């Protein structure tokens, strides 16, 4: 091989490496700040949730404390949850210099991440490590579009495909449909109904269920209703109304209380409702990165 050929090969290698670096910098998954609709550069958030008896007696049953820590790019580096003071779950992420997750420790499992490009999309593959039984290692593959939003997700358990979903967004980047590619009939449709005063409803519709979220013009959640369908009958499963909502100076939620109701007629979706009692209280504290 002549010297000129070697130079050409080296140039090709450097060009390929530069292209990969460029794509890495151009495509990053949507930040967790964005997913959680957080305002400002949140360093950590600690959410304390008080869960009360479902009978409406007001008796406190559980206290959940979830602490989430973010890096300066808005991605979660660690999240832990305690229930009544006892550890319940934990996840820890390690990132590379390119800003992408390289390793995840989730409870007792460890995942290593690899990345490739499918056209203009970024594909992340997380493989579970140190699994003795070859039939149970888990592998998850997520595809991100140019805007960083997840557009496809597949999950394998021991080599068997168990999840195959596609995510569809409108022109504003709002999720409108989750397609179940394994069971097309089980897809989820998401729609919005907006009122002239700025209030709106978010309706999530599955084949046998519906979840309706009611929001004030400022984005505060006012009410939530879940409905299950049995043939032609619609049975209300749960109704929650929210009060005592407050936000900090950046606009992030700091307090919310939910009260549970039930319909006077369990098969009548828009009828009168009866108050059961206190359901949950949420308090959230934030730390921010210094500007």
Residue spans for each PLM region:
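Buried hydrophobic residues that stabilize the cores of well-folded domains
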Residues: 25-291
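Bacterial N-terminal signal peptides
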Residues: 15-22
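Sec-dependent signal peptide recognition
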Residues: 8-15
């Amino acid at each position: 091989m002549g010297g000129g050929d070697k130079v050409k090969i080296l140039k090709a290698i450097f060009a390929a490496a530069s292209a990969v670096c460029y794509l890495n910098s151009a495509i990053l998954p949507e930040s967790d700040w964005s997913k959680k609709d957080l305002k400002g550069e949140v360093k950590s958030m600690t959410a304390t949730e008080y869960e009360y008896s479902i009978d409406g007696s007001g008796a406190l049953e559980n206290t959940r404390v979830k602490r989430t820590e973010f890096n300066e790019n808005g991605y979660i580096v660690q999240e832990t949850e305690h229930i009544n003071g006892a550890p319940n779950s934990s996840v820890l992420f390690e990132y590379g210099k390119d800003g992408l997750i390289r390793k995840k420790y989730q409870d007792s499992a460890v995942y290593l991440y690899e990345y490739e490009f499918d056209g203009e999309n970024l594909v992340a593959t997380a493989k579970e490590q140190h699994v003795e039984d070859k039939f149970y290692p888990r592998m998850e593959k997520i595809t991100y579009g140019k805007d960083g939003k997840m557009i496809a997700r597949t999950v394998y358990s021991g080599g068997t495909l168990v999840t195959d979903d596609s995510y569809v967004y409108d022109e504003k980047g709002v999720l409108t449909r989750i397609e179940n590619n394994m069971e097309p009939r089980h897809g989820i449709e998401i729609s919005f109904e907006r009122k002239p005063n700025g209030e709106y409803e978010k309706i999530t519709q599955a084949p046998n269920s519906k979840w309706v979220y009611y929001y004030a013009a400022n984005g505060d959640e006012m009410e939530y209703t879940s409905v299950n369908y049995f043939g032609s009958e619609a049975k209300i499963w749960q109704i929650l109304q929210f009060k005592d909502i407050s936000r900090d100076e950046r606009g992030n939620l700091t307090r919310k209380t939910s009260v549970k109701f039930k319909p006077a007629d369990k098969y009548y979706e828009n009828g009168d409702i009866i108050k059961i009692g206190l359901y949950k209280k949420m308090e959230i504290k934030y730390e921010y990165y210094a500007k």
